[in-house]
């Protein structure tokens, strides 16, 4: 990704609210207040002008629009008897967007959409951990080992578990992992329940897997208060890393694979041929979030920039894997992970 361009844009976004406050806003509007109608109006307006997925979530031609919801919720706000009740009502309103990046942060709670609704059962963390034993190592937030569990020692399959992108994964970490798995003829990267974090982690891991320097996606940023106010698509380019892994690979995903982890799936699926994805459709989260403060001091986070894959398709709704596979009762009874076992079988078949 062009980090210089992205950082410059972020600096501009940070400075713009300060300029607007200094030049246009009435100081009275900045006063702290717990008034429910005032805070509801602020929340609704912030999302109305800044949220980037109304066309997908609540289109103007749909049965219910964002303006319709304002009319529906205004009398309900007037009936709120407590701060907790008002908080829950605002979260209910936001959940109409079905976006895990739209969250409300109060001193007493955090609310938002549950990205796992309607998901397949794809992960038993306790069983997954068995496949890392007894030779597990850790490089940053990557847990890895050659698989020996369940009589797979001779198969020579490497296994990486990345439960989160919240901590930085450096090229030093990746070099350590791939050097120690260099003898493996195939690799499984487990991204199940990785809820995202630092987009730079997706960039670095993808740069190891892509075959060459390439465009892995596109981004479009909100440029005005209208629902259609967007700038042109900007390319997301990645350079192939000094470390490279081009052997057969299976990446495991589920509905918990979200945000930056979802971006990794988009980057790699659209640009590689040696990588298969297995599990369930990813959770999505194809919008870069930003935050705004409400008059009562609560913080509202929401998606403000839209991301697309290399084929210019939106990744907000999630990405379908090549192979649908869920954890089975039979596999659980045998203390086996059905996805890992199937991935091993595919990798062995592909190496024959």
Roles of regions detected by a PLM:
Residues 1-30:
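Bacterial Sec-dependent N-terminal signal peptides
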Residues 324-351:
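Extracytoplasmic/peripheral linker and loop segments enriched in polar/acidic and small residues
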Residues 200-334:
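Conserved acidic, small-residue-rich alpha-beta core segments centered on
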